[in-house]
Amino acid sequence: MKIGIIGAMEPEVAHLIAAMTNASSQTIAGIEFIAGTLAGKDVVVTRSGIGKVAASIATTLLIEKYAPDAVINTGSAGGFVDSLSIGDIVISSEVRHHDVDVTAFGYEIGQMAQQPAAFIPAPYLVEAANKAIKQLGEVKAIEGLICTGDSFICDPVRTKTMLEHFPTMAACEMEGAAIAQVCHQFGVPFVVIRSLSDNANNDSPVDFDSYIVKAGYHSALMVMLLLEQLDPNSVK
């Protein structure tokens, strides 16, 4: 079993890379891919860069060059659930674009033309994540809708509009749906694991800078615990 792990920023992958053994590195199109062992599994970890285009490029290269059995997207997100605090975790129940609108042609808001409205993670990866939750201690984790767009959300007016479009949204970020869409195209199972760095409000820029390291650590810890729960025979 080989697992691809994608984070956008250095704090989102640093703890994973530090915990790897037998690591080797290759750079393709300016993106570093580090192959090795983590939590007893063969993994390839990469820092994609921020945003949907960067994430799509990294995911495509990862799948084409390394042929992972599954892909995990890790990192930070803005939170939309009152019961969650900064540092808590959202596991994707589904992933959608929040900044796509081709409704004029009969598609749902957030649905890219010729694509599903929502990208659904592999049940066995979500199951492994839920098992890992029990080992997180004081960190709270839930399953929920994660939405993606090429904007850092810190405007209450925009937050209100997003919640009108996606009332069950638990978190938003800038890469997950792009990674999910590429995985969908290639038929590769995926899951998105995000730790909250802010609450998508006026304080978000300050909160993000203050808490990105904490969010990156919690998300990385969750990924490592998830890897420990994975049964090589469960890949499907």
From Swiss-Prot:
Catalysis: reaction(s): S-adenosyl-L-homocysteine + H2O = S-(5-deoxy-D-ribos-5-yl)-L-homocysteine + adenine; S-methyl-5'-thioadenosine + H2O = 5-(methylsulfanyl)-D-ribose + adenine; 5'-deoxyadenosine + H2O = 5-deoxy-D-ribose + adenine
Keywords for the protein's UniProt record, in alphabetical order: Amino-acid biosynthesis, Hydrolase, Methionine biosynthesis
InterPro entries linked to this entry: MTA_SAH_Nsdase, Nucleoside_phosphorylase_d, Nucleoside_phosphorylase_sf
Active site feature: 12, 198
Gene3D superfamilies: Nucleoside phosphorylase domain (3.40.50.1580)
Keyword Amino-acid biosynthesis listed: yes
UniProt pathway annotation: Amino-acid biosynthesis; L-methionine biosynthesis via salvage pathway; S-methyl-5-thio-alpha-D-ribose 1-phosphate from S-methyl-5'-thioadenosine (hydrolase route): step 1/2
Protein residues bound to substrate: 78, 153, 174-175
Enzyme nomenclature, EC number: 3.2.2.9
A Pfam family annotated for this UniProt entry: PNP_UDP_1
Class of the enzyme per the UniProt entry, highest EC level: hydrolase
GO BP, sorted A to Z: L-methionine salvage from methylthioadenosine; L-methionine salvage from S-adenosylmethionine; nucleoside catabolic process
Residue intervals passing through the bilayer: none
GO MF entries: adenosylhomocysteine nucleosidase activity; methylthioadenosine nucleosidase activity
GO cellular component, as recorded: cytosol
HAMAP family: Salvage_MtnN (MF_01684)
NCBIfam families per record: MTA_SAH-Nsdase, PRK05584.1
Function as written in the Swiss-Prot or TrEMBL entry: Catalyzes the irreversible cleavage of the glycosidic bond in both 5'-methylthioadenosine (MTA) and S-adenosylhomocysteine (SAH/AdoHcy) to adenine and the corresponding thioribose, 5'-methylthioribose and S-ribosylhomocysteine, respectively. Also cleaves 5'-deoxyadenosine, a toxic by-product of radical S-adenosylmethionine (SAM) enzymes, into 5-deoxyribose and adenine.
PANTHER family per the UniProt record, alphabetical: 5'-METHYLTHIOADENOSINE/S-ADENOSYLHOMOCYSTEINE NUCLEOSIDASE (PTHR46832), 5'-METHYLTHIOADENOSINE_S-ADENOSYLHOMOCYSTEINE NUCLEOSIDASE (PTHR46832:SF1)
Family note: Belongs to the PNP/UDP phosphorylase family. MtnN subfamily.
Official protein name in the record: 5'-methylthioadenosine/S-adenosylhomocysteine nucleosidase
Source organism of the structure: Shewanella sp. (strain MR-4)
